[in-house]
Amino acid sequence: MSKQTGAHTHEEKGKNVPVILFFTGLALFFIGLFLGNMLLVKNILFSLAAILAGYHIIGEGFGDTYRDTKNNRKFSPNIHLLMTLAAVGSALMGSFEESALLILIFAAAHFLEDYAQGKSQREITKLLNLNPTEARLITDDGSIQTVSVEQLKIGDRVQVLNGAQIPTDGVVIEGSTAVDESSINGESIPKEKNSGDPVFGSTMNGSGTIVVEVTKDSSETVFAKIVQLVNQSQENQSEIASKIKRFEPKYVTLVLAVFPLIVLGGALLFQLTWAESFYRGLVFLIAASPCALAASAVPATLSGISNLAKQGVLFKGGSFLSNLAEVKALAFDKTGTLTKGKPEVTDYLFVDGLEDRQDELVAVLTNMEKKSNHPLATAIVNRFEAETTALNLEVENIVGVGLVTTIADTTFRIGKPSSFEQVPTIIEKQTTKLASEGKTVVYFAENQQVIGLVALMDVPNEEAMNAIHYFKSQNIETTMITGDAKLTGEAVGRLVGVDQVFANVLPEEKSAIVDQLKHEVGMTGMVGDGINDAPALVNADIGVAMGDGTDIAIDVADVVVMKNDLSKLGYAHRVSKRLNKIVQQNIIFSMLVVATLIILNFLGIANIAFSVLIHEGSTLVVIFNGLRLLVNTK
């Protein structure tokens, strides 16, 4: 019934007035029912009841039709016009009571539908209202000044009290706390934050007062981007919703064209009286009205988008959410998408006979790596630091050799395997095995003799493996794209469980692989997080950016997962499938109701009151069916 594009101006401008007038009209209608034989007074009261209760419906029927016709330069009637004409026609026949009843039922359903459709909109508004407005700025003299968030500049320092909202994106420079980041990524478990850790605007400071240095303008924060994406998503309708919107004026025009044929046919072919034939035409206007059909897609789509936004998955439009269920292939960038994005120690080994010295040697290894800023060194330190004692070492980083230190005339060296000439057989065999598993190996030597190794790998994250398993269960072909060597790429691919791996891929080649998948498999999605993923994200039917990724990847993608958790993309796929199923249910149900009412009208069974009651009831059923998507999908 409702015009989905927001023609309900009565909601925005004095939204209580239509409700007050509706109940005034309802009261007049009931007064008229009890006036007995005072026919003139009754008809006046019924007419006033219809005008007061349905003035906004009449206005939208004639006013919007005139405006849309003028803008489109062709006749563009709407559903409200059908109801208005049916009410006017009924009054012209002298059935003022039935005319008023039609408008009252239609208006009552109108308010219920607006409320129901507004529920998904209100859920989105709740999210947008989380946007912080004020901040406690620390001035140059150390005093605290409350300012609007828009006044903050990069480099400013702000104080965030216990239990307060963090006003903007920044980095902690004083204090420690636990932050609830559910407004950003949908995760309810607070994250520990210490000096140097990033924080995001709109999140809630939990357990301690902190000082944050502003790192982004208020318009560029993560939450500001979320607001932008959510607003954009409401404007971009699903394909089926767009088709229904375009179809509505054509359908209503057809109904209006059929109306005189029914009136003439009833009188000339079926020997009905002109009054009865005209009445059947009026019932047809109501029965054929596509109210429920018009509400089949938009409320459901907004509900799905709202649900996913609360889970930290942002769609830039309803069309992308609807299309996700149709994807036949998904291509994944490896680093940071399927893997954690940072190397971790997976294995370490010392040659036989050094069991008693293992703790000592691990301590030397760890303290040597502390002197390096290489990612592999960081991974080794993270793995062993808690288990070792600190040593004061002089470490030299020699190009082509590695890290070298001397302790009491004993020289220790850490380097890549190719920098060592002689290697024990056990180390050599393990190196071959570990390399076949896609792991990077570094050697540890004492006095030029290799005595151990450490293997590292950018390991797959568990959420990614579970997500790949889910997508494969949905018959979606999964592909991993990586710039790594073939051996490493295929090893990671086996661990994650993807169907195929493209290794040694240059950034500019990723888009060509997406083209290949589109040609061979069908609708293809691309999931990535880096600048080099941007061309492929744009080229894919659906581009998905992981939230820890670069701004350019997020800007060009159609979907943003605010946390690097692919299980959330799997959840979005389930919501998409459920959305399409609900929309199909709504369309079939609404068409069956229209067909049933038209048949009952031709059989002479349906009257105006019955038709409008069933018709508006079916519209409410369709809307509430769509609102089920506000509830989490299993």
What is each stretch, according to the model?
Residues 2-3, 33, 46-132, 157, ...:
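Actuator/coupling domain of P-type ATPases
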Residues 2-16, 29-35, 60-66, 70, ...:
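Membrane-embedded alpha-helical bundles of multi-pass transporters
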Residues 43-67, 101-114, 119-126, 238-332, ...:
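Hydrophobic alpha-helical transmembrane segments
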Residues 126-212, 216-217, 319-365, 406:
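Conserved cytosolic catalytic loops of P-type ATPases
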Residues 210-216, 442, 479, 552, ...:
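A short beta-strand structural signal in non-transmembrane regions
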Residues 350-474, 500:
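P-type ATPase nucleotide-binding
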Residues 409, 452-585:
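Conserved ATP-binding TGD loop and adjacent catalytic N/P-domain core of P-type ATPases
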